[in-house]
Amino acid sequence: MQFSKMHGLGNDFVVVDGVTQNVFFTPETIRRLANRHCGIGFDQLLIVEAPYDPELDFHYRIFNADGSEVSQCGNGARCFARFVTLKGLTNKKDISVSTQKGNMVLTVKDDNQIRVNMGEPIWEPAKIPFTANKFEKNYILRTDIQTVLCGAVSMGNPHCVVQVDDIQTANVEQLGPLLESHERFPERVNAGFMQIINKEHIKLRVYERGAGETQACGSGACAAVAVGIMQGLLNNNVQVDLPGGSLMIEWNGVGHPLYMTGEATHIYDGFITL
């Protein structure tokens, strides 16, 4: 099997062309490949498939390092666009793809940046999914070590966002896994820890569902900005600094799609026997 190793701000991926080669992965195979000592090593495995809908260009599948399939990965989407362009699978600047939860448009810009239309943030608790009677801008979550206020939103995958005073000292290691597996998120959740620098600049760390804390989480950056805007804390264009680098997020509010812009880097190509 041919593959490419890529990263978006240090969030690393193995990307596989499932259009020109037949590929099938069991969860056990994915876990073995994800092992950084005995396999290739990655946060997520991305598979490019032929479109399920003839109106679209590709279908986009995402698997976490633990073998679980998920519906969205923003950093992965940028790498997906870079991959299909590099491999000559398309020459379009605007690439339309489907995911488990909907469609996306990925735009390859002239400055080497990728702009992703992430769709509209989803706030209805049942659709996140999150257990709550109605939408609120802040929810109280109780864990074994502390009670937190958080925003909850789906960007095609579930996110909870907690505001912290200092990103460096935030208790991500302990609180992250407790939020990820919190009973009010039946499909688990990506936990974001956001420090607001000003209305157009935040710092963020994300404990990702099925992957742990990563260098960057694109959908997590989108979720944090969406929550901050809904809570009246942020403007419509925000720079998000993650451990691996920065993203620009734009959102004009309810009824509008949210856009993420950032880099996608090709590291190397390889061949492995499964």
UniProtKB/Swiss-Prot annotation:
- A GO BP entry: lysine biosynthetic process via diaminopimelate
Q: Where along the sequence do coiled-coil regions lie?
A: none
Q: Catalytic positions?
A: C73 (proton donor), C217 (proton acceptor)
The UniProt-reported impact of C217S is: Enzymatically active, but it adopts a more open conformation. It is able to catalyze both epimerization of DAP and HF elimination of L,L-3-fluoro-DAP and D,L-3-fluoro-DAP. Able to slowly eliminate HF but does not catalyze epimerization
InterPro entries xrefs: DAP_epimerase_AS, DAP_epimerase_DapF
List the Gene Ontology MF annotations in alphabetical order: diaminopimelate epimerase activity
Keywords attached to this entry? Amino-acid biosynthesis, Cytoplasm, Isomerase, Lysine biosynthesis
| Residues involved in substrate binding | N11, Q44, N64, G74, N75, N157, N190, E208, R209, G218, S219
User: What GO CC terms are in its UniProt record?
Assistant: cytosol
Major localisation:
cytoplasm
Return the annotated site residues (Important for dimerization).
Y268
Means of activity regulation: Inhibited by LL-aziridino (LL-AziDAP), DL-aziridino (DL-AziDAP). Also inhibited by (2S,3R,6S)-2,6-diamino-3-fluoropimelate (L,L-3-fluoro-DAP) and (2R,3S,6S)-2,6-diamino-3-fluoropimelate (D,L-3-fluoro-DAP).
PANTHER family, per database record:
DIAMINOPIMELATE EPIMERASE (PTHR31689:SF0), DIAMINOPIMELATE EPIMERASE, CHLOROPLASTIC (PTHR31689)
Which family does the entry's similarity section mention? Belongs to the diaminopimelate epimerase family.
Additional notes on this entry:
DapF utilizes a two-base mechanism involving a pair of cysteine residues (Cys-73 and Cys-217).
Query: What job does the chain carry out?
Result: Catalyzes the stereoinversion of LL-2,6-diaminopimelate (L,L-DAP) to meso-diaminopimelate (meso-DAP), a precursor of L-lysine and an essential component of the bacterial peptidoglycan. Only accepts DAP isomers with the L configuration.
Subunit (UniProt): Homodimer (Potential). Previously DapF has been proposed to be a monomer, however it seems that it adopts a dimeric structure.
Q: What is this protein called?
A: Diaminopimelate epimerase
